[in-house]
């Protein structure tokens, strides 16, 4: 198996078997509290970096500081990856949301109105858009050290791994969304890291992941 490093805010609900896994190094911290040197050490030697960071679903988490939690984390992680000056490009995966639309994706008038409201009134939505835009516009497709994929799940739920689909654009409007199991998101991200053909298919893109309906 792989050697992993993870940064977690809390170990309260962490499975004991993972705590005892010799291939797993756990860094207990809020990511933005790490110094530049600590951030560099966290990513040094990593072939891939995956971020599932998000705002907690409370009033303070959604409207308190830092309002651009994900954006600042993405910026600092990318700076740290660049500073390692690895001979091989590092894969960077960001879990985002299907509510963040790709430039040029078709949206209805109603969706455009709602997304505009969310962008201006709900800081986490703006944060999701800005973090993906940073990768798209600042890292781009020809970066010397980083390749990226932004993974867009629909309505997240907790359940076991199941069959899922991956498509380039959302198959439904935000008013008629689908569900995505968190475990399926994790599985897809791991598959992207492990399978060169899958990475080549989605690098520099924003694939949508959702549970496959049982017929």
Give names to the regions the model predicted.
Residues 1-3, 9-19, 34, 56-57, ...:
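Oxidoreductase cofactor-interface core, primarily capturing Rossmann-like NAD(P)-dependent enzymes
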Residues 6, 12-76, 80-83:
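NAD(P)H-binding glycine-rich loop region in Rossmannoid oxidoreductase-like domains
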